[in-house]
Amino acid sequence: MPELPEVETVRKGLEKLVVGKTIQEVIVFWPRIIESPEVDVFQGQLAGQTIEGIERRGKFLIFKLSDNDMISHLRMEGKYEFHQADDEIAKHTHVMFTFTDGTQLRYLDVRKFGRMTLVPKNQGHQYKGILALGPEPTPDVFQLATFQQGLKKHHKAIKPLLLDQKLVTGLGNIYVDEALWQAQIHPEQPADSLKPAEVATLYQAIIDVLARAVEAGGTTIRTYLNALGEAGTFQVALNVYGQTGLPCNRCGTPIVKTKVAQRGTHYCPQCQQLKGRRLK
């Protein structure tokens, strides 16, 4: 699943490719991609609108249009590709935006889980899925004191708590594993058991890991490519995710893989020891 660094990289690429272009026509091959309004209304409303900008909130893309905001979530395998209108249409292409200059933005999704929604202009940040998100993982809005207070309220394991997007947004499976490894915290450690120094270390690790991943253009594990068709490079810097059986870069102990909250989870059994009772 594209996480914050991948979605931010897609946003930057799309900004270069389609901002300023006017939509001539929208073709929808898989109607379920369109959450609302009805497909024919979606197509009709977009025709003639100009893309004025592209924003991101968590893992959501917000296309700023002349008359609406269009919200897009890539979910598991969604991606955008930029084409000439006469280019061959690839398998798994579900939505095509044709511009007045003869170029196209195409949405492809092997799993068909991605969704698009039209909302009134400048109301993208009021969308229900976006309103539920925690702060972005940057020091100006992600505050250590608030993060610490939030963790104290939860006895659940730290990994699923970080994945639910309410304390801080943008973390998915890859970057939670990486941040917990950097902070030397076991993924099943109860959140309310973390000491202030551990919370501070984790807070900084979240900011650091995501910032470095954005700079690297994200992580390409399977199918992720940015809007320019380029792979991310952060996979070469992964310390724990996907490193099962390889020596820990900090202590040399083999990395292990387990399941936490039904998610494949990687950690170092030496550096990230569970303190106290294991949560179920």
Swiss-Prot record:
DNA binds at residues 92, 111. It catalyses: Hydrolysis of DNA containing ring-opened 7-methylguanine residues, releasing 2,6-diamino-4-hydroxy-5-(N-methyl)formamidopyrimidine; 2'-deoxyribonucleotide-(2'-deoxyribose 5'-phosphate)-2'-deoxyribonucleotide-DNA = a 3'-end 2'-deoxyribonucleotide-(2,3-dehydro-2,3-deoxyribose 5'-phosphate)-DNA + a 5'-end 5'-phospho-2'-deoxyribonucleoside-DNA + H(+). The keyword RNA-binding does not apply. InterPro entries: DNA_glyclase/AP_lyase_DNA-bd, DNA_glyclase_Znf_dom_DNA_BS, Formamido-pyr_DNA_Glyclase, FPG_cat, MutM-like_N-ter, Ribosomal_uS13-like_H2TH, Znf_DNA_glyclase/AP_lyase, Znf_FPG/IleRS. Binds 1 zinc ion per subunit. PROSITE patterns: FPG_CAT, ZF_FPG_1, ZF_FPG_2. GO terms for molecular function: 8-oxo-7,8-dihydroguanine DNA N-glycosylase activity; class I DNA-(apurinic or apyrimidinic site) endonuclease activity; damaged DNA binding; zinc ion binding. The active site is at residues 2-3, 59, 263. Its EC number is 3.2.2.23, 4.2.99.18. Keywords: DNA damage, DNA repair, DNA-binding, Glycosidase, Hydrolase, Lyase, Metal-binding, Multifunctional enzyme, Zinc, Zinc-finger. Belongs to the FPG family. HAMAP family: Fapy_DNA_glycosyl. Involved in base excision repair of DNA damaged by oxidation or by mutagenic agents. Acts as a DNA glycosylase that recognizes and removes damaged bases. Has a preference for oxidized purines, such as 7,8-dihydro-8-oxoguanine (8-oxoG). Has AP (apurinic/apyrimidinic) lyase activity and introduces nicks in the DNA strand. Cleaves the DNA backbone by beta-delta elimination to generate a single-strand break at the site of the removed base with both 3'- and 5'-phosphates. Monomer. This is Formamidopyrimidine-DNA glycosylase. The lineage of its organism: Bacteria, Bacillati, Bacillota, Bacilli, Lactobacillales.
